[in-house]
Amino acid sequence: MGIRIYNDLTRKKEDFVPLEPGKVRFYNCGPTVYDYFHIGNARNFVVFDTVRRYLEYRGYQVTFVQNFTDIDDRMIKRARERGITVSELAEEMIQAYFADAGALGVRPADVHPRATALIDEQIAMIQQLIDKGHAYVVEGGDVYFRVTTSPDYGKLSHKNLEELVAGASERVDPDDRKEHPFDFALWKGQKPGEPAWPAPWGPGRPGWHIECSAMARKYLGDTIDIHAGGEDLTFPHHENEIAQSEAVTGKPFARYWMHNAHLMIDGAKMSKSVGNFFTVRDILKRYDGEVVRMFLLSAHYRTQLSFSDQLMEDTRRALERLYNTVANLEHLAKTAPRAEMTAEEQAVLAELSQARERFVAAMDDDFNTAEGLAVIFDLSRELNSRVKPGASAAFAEGGLALLRELAGVLGLLERKAQPQELDAEIEALIAARQEARKARNFAEADRIRDQLRAMGIILEDTPQGVRWRRA
C-alpha cells in the first residue's frame, strides 16, 4: 500500500496518486506578514513541512510553494500604526518568519512568492474572469466574482449557496453594489493613502483570494496535487480559490485538500483577533525550537491540540529521553571494544529495523505523526535495553542510524546529542570518583555519583571498567 490522504474535498481517505508520477505539486497558504506568527500558525508550518519531508522520504520529487500575503487591510493598518510603509513592514516580518520558522526546523519552501510581485498575473486572471462573465466591475473600481456562475460553489465546505446564505447572514458583506451576498472581491479600488497598482478598470490592489490562485498557478500550473492550509481557511478562502481558478482554466484547481485543526488554549481557538495567543518568538525564549516542533507533531494534524506549559514540559522531557538514547549510542560506538557485529547483533538489528515498516505504515495513513512518534519512542526504549556496554561499534552505529533516520523524517534529532565539552566534564568526574575510591574516600565517591545522577548520568561497573550512560 502507498500513502493515503484524507481529502477534505471528498471527506474520505484516498490513495495518493499525483498528477505526474513521482512528482508532487504542493501549495500551502502562508502567513499574512503584518506581525510575528503565533504557535497556532506554527502548527500549519510544521505539519506541512513534515508532510513535505515524508513525501520526499518516500521518493517523491516535491515542488513546495508557500506564499507571503504582503498586502491587505491588516498590513495597511499596522503600517500606519507604526509609521512605516507596507513594504517595509512586509520585509521586516518576512525576515522574522524565516528566523522563527527556521528555529522550529521548518525548511524554506522551493518558492516563497509575494503577492505584490505577481500583480500582473492577478490582473490577467481578473481580466479573463470579466471577459468570461464570471466577474463584474462596480462603481469605485472594485471587481467582484459572480458566484452564481460557479455551479458547484460550496463543494469544499459541502454547502450550497442557499445554505451558506441562510447560515452566515452576519458574516456577509452588505455592500449593495454586489449582485449576490457571497460575491467576493477580486480587486479593491484605490482609497486615499493606500498602495495601489494600475489596472484596466482603475487603480487599486488585489483581493486576498486571487493572490493565492495566481501564485499557485504561476509556479505549479493549472492543477496542483495538494493544497494545504489551516481549517479556518476552508471557507471562504479556499472555496473562493477553487471558484475563480476553475472559472479561468476549466480544470480542477487542486486534487487533494488538506487542513490542519486549530491549536486551542483554555478551550478556545488561539487567535490574534481574540488576543489569546503566544508568538513563537516569545515561546522560543522558554523552550528549544525542537521541543515546540515535537509538541506540534504529538497529535494527528486533523485533531485539535491544546497548548499548556505542562504539555510543553512533558514534551521537553520526552525529547531529552531521545537525546539520551542518542548520546548513549554515540558513547558506546566510540568506546566499543570491537568494530564488527556478531551474528547475534546482526539478528537483533534486523529485528529492530522492523520499526521502519511500522513507521512507514503510520505515516502512510494520512501522515499520522502521533503514531510515528510512538514508533520512534518504542525503538528508543528497545535500543536502550538491547545495545549494552561491550556491544560492537557497528551495532551501536546501526541502531543510532535507524533512530536518526526515522526521527529525521519528522525533523527531529537533527542536532548533536551533547557538546563534547560536557562529555569531557563527565569523564573528569568519573576519573575523580575512581581516585576517591582508590583512596577509600567513599563519602567523596558517593557525592560524585550523586552529582552525576543529578546530571542524568548512570554509572555501570563492567569488567572493562566504569562506563556511563544517560538515564
Curated annotation (Swiss-Prot):
Keyword Aminoacyl-tRNA synthetase tagged: yes
Coiled-coil region list: none
Record protein name field: Cysteine--tRNA ligase
Reaction(s) the record says it catalyses: tRNA(Cys) + L-cysteine + ATP = L-cysteinyl-tRNA(Cys) + AMP + diphosphate
Residues annotated to bind Zn(2+): 29, 212, 237, 241
Keywords assigned: Aminoacyl-tRNA synthetase, ATP-binding, Cytoplasm, Ligase, Metal-binding, Nucleotide-binding, Protein biosynthesis, Zinc
PANTHER family named among the record's database cross-references: CYSTEINE--TRNA LIGASE, CYTOPLASMIC (PTHR10890:SF3), CYSTEINYL-TRNA SYNTHETASE (PTHR10890)
Pfam family, any one: DALR_2
Annotated source species: Symbiobacterium thermophilum (strain DSM 24528 / JCM 14929 / IAM 14863 / T)
Motif annotated as 'HIGH' region, chain positions: 31-41
Span(s) of short sequence motif 'KMSKS' region: 269-273
GO CC annotation: cytosol
Positions bound to ATP: 272
Family matches, as Gene3D superfamilies: Cysteine-tRNA ligase, C-terminal anti-codon recognition domain (1.20.120.1910), HUPs (3.40.50.620)
Source species taxonomy: Bacteria, Bacillati, Bacillota, Clostridia, Eubacteriales
Family in the record: Belongs to the class-I aminoacyl-tRNA synthetase family.
Gene: cysS
InterPro entries: Cys-tRNA-ligase, Cys-tRNA-synt_Ia_DALR, Cys-tRNA/MSH_ligase, CysS_C, Rossmann-like_a/b/a_fold, tRNA-synt_1_cat_dom, tRNAsynth_Ia_anticodon-bd
HAMAP family: Cys_tRNA_synth
